[in-house]
A protein has these predicted regions:
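Short, Lys/Arg-enriched N-terminal segments with co-localized hydrophobic residues
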Residues: 5-25
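Hydrophobic, proline/glycine-rich low-complexity stretches
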Residues: 26-89, 93-94, 102-103, 302
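A short glycine-rich, His/Asp/Glu-containing loop-to-beta-strand
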Residues: 60-92, 185-228
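Acidic/His-leaning functional-site neighborhoods
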Residues: 66, 198-269, 274-277
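A short beta-strand-loop-beta hairpin characteristic of the jelly-roll/cupin
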Residues: 97-125, 232-258
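Acidic, low-complexity central loop/insert segments
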Residues: 109-148, 152-157
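Conserved metal-binding segment of the jelly-roll/cupin
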Residues: 123-142, 255-276, 285
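Double-stranded beta-helix
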Residues: 145-186, 281-303
């Protein structure tokens, strides 16, 4: 079942106060977990309602989805004419947004800034930022309203504070995979990953498919110890991605448009094929941060 809730923010004393709809600084949709045995009976509408995040960005707003799968929050912040803040809320029972959480951000839009406790970080397109647990103030702005930044966010619970780190795309750990012959030539850019920096449990990166390639994560896999969220973008007009999900012997698909995200439970495969090449951001949290801790599946074994 899907619940949509409006967030509240705290006043100067840390007291939760309800506010008028027009003043709400961000929106949160809560998604409860689902079982694989149930999911194989879902209709297309139910599958989309459970796993698809249709709207990630809206001007001067923060659109967030809270999944009870490992309690990840995925969403987007798109400041245009004003700054947008992430603040404490009743859903998190916290005085500040990152009171008990860590966060990763990748900017897919124009140049912008993120202020963390008064320290500003400039992010151009494809730059990333890790913010450790305990940061008190988070503010997002765009340099040019005509070309606004689009900050894609993943955040999950944390147990320790690690330093805030800016990760330019040039500093990401790069893993070329696939080939032209198999239509899956791509580069995995690992931003928040033990090979680059320390975090509690969040891993986050961006995979870029080469022109002429349209398959991601194929051969596919599952990883029982981590859930994952995919965010598809850089998809050309009038093109789509067929995102594959479900247990390996009970596969289903979701039609994804540009700048949409999808929740992948730990029991589900997660792969896709587009009608053109595209880019996607992946974020994981769970039991460990071992990127290669996965159960690979031969394509001929899929059903």
């Amino acid at each position: 079942m899907v619940f949509t809730k409006k967030l509240c923010y705290t006043d100067s004393k840390g007291t939760f106060e309800p506010i008028n709809k027009e003043d709400i600084p961000m929106q949160l949709t809560v998604r409860q977990p689902s079982a694989s045995e149930d999911a194989k009976h879902y209709t297309t509408e139910r599958l989309r309602g459970e796993y698809l995040i249709e709207t990630v960005f809206a001007p001067d707003d923060a659109i967030l989805t809270y999944s009870h799968f490992d309690r990840i929050i995925a969403g987007g912040v798109m400041p245009v004419s004003k700054s947008v803040e992430l603040v404490g809320c009743t859903e998190l029972a916290s005085d500040t947004f990152l009171q008990r959480r860590e966060m990763g951000v990748i900017n897919i839009g124009g140049k912008g800034k993120i202020s963390v406790d008064g320290v500003e970080y400039d992010l151009k397109q494809y730059d990333g930022l890790y913010v450790g647990m305990g940061a008190k103030t988070l503010s997002f702005t765009s340099d040019d309203p005509a070309d606004p930044a689009k900050f894609y966010i993943n955040t999950c619970p944390a147990h320790k504070t690690y330093p805030t780190v800016k990760i330019d795309i040039d500093k990401a750990n790069k893993r070329p995979l696939g080939s032209v012959e198999t239509c899956n030539k791509r580069v995995i850019n690992q931003y928040i990953h033990p090979a680059v920096m320390q975090s509690c449990q969040l891993c986050m990166g961006m995979t870029q498919l080469a022109p002429g390639s349209n398959w991601n994560s194929m051969p596919c896999h599952t990883h029982e110890r981590r859930m994952e969220v995919y965010f598809y973008f850089d998809l050309k007009d009038n093109n789509v991605v067929f995102h594959m999900m479900g247990e390996p012997t009970e596969t289903r698909h979701l039609l994804m448009h540009n700048e949409q995200a999808v929740i992948s439970p730990s029991w589900s495969i997660h792969t896709g094929v587009g009608t053109s090449n595209y880019t996607f951001i992946w974020g994981m949290c769970g039991e460990n941060q071992e990127f290669d801790d996965m159960d690979n599946i031969d394509p001929i074994d899929l059903r």
